[in-house]
Amino acid sequence: MAYSSKPWGYVIYRTTYTPESTSLWPRAIDTINTYVAHFTLETLTEQNKESSYEEIISRLENIPIQDPTLDGATYDELRVHFASWLQTQDRRGESGDRDLPRARFRTFLVIDQAALEMIANAPNPADEGADPRAVSRPCLTAVAAQHHEGRRLRPTRSARGPRDVNEGQLFPGWMKVPIFTLHELWEANSERLDLIELCPSDFVDEPVWEP
């Protein structure tokens, strides 16, 4: 897994402020951290690197952002807020490099009411007998911090077929991400891959990332 010695984790926006959401929000954040920790350990174990788990997970730092003025905010409105937030975080180390991990500049996460309810009520993946389908179902939205309308995804097609820059679907600037894959999304972002390079091109209603 691609981790530097810096803190890692995403900025997570809350865009619903109903009375019910106030109690669900901290549960949802706890659930996300639980899932990231559980599946990070699972991946490290598969790679025979579980000895590094404690050090890696100690640097996990998802950053929840709550602001009632963002109730129902659009992705473009969140991009403006995110850009302003980054300006307050743009510290530089002794080498002159940014202290923030690169992946945190490229993508942020959004939780609306539907996602909030699903995540807050998700089962603990470590529980014996947890339904795998229930574990894999909760999703949130990953949003590209910078998005230019009109960019297209690479079409899924035979390499021998004719190429046309206008053949791929338009990239919406976001995709749904199951929370059990967030550690893999971070790794992909850390390897200099933007959402447009990760977003599936064969979606019908909405893109859902599958690593």
Model regions and ranges:
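Extended, charge-biased low-complexity segments
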Residues: 1-172
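Acidic, proline/glycine-rich low-complexity IDRs
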Residues: 151-211
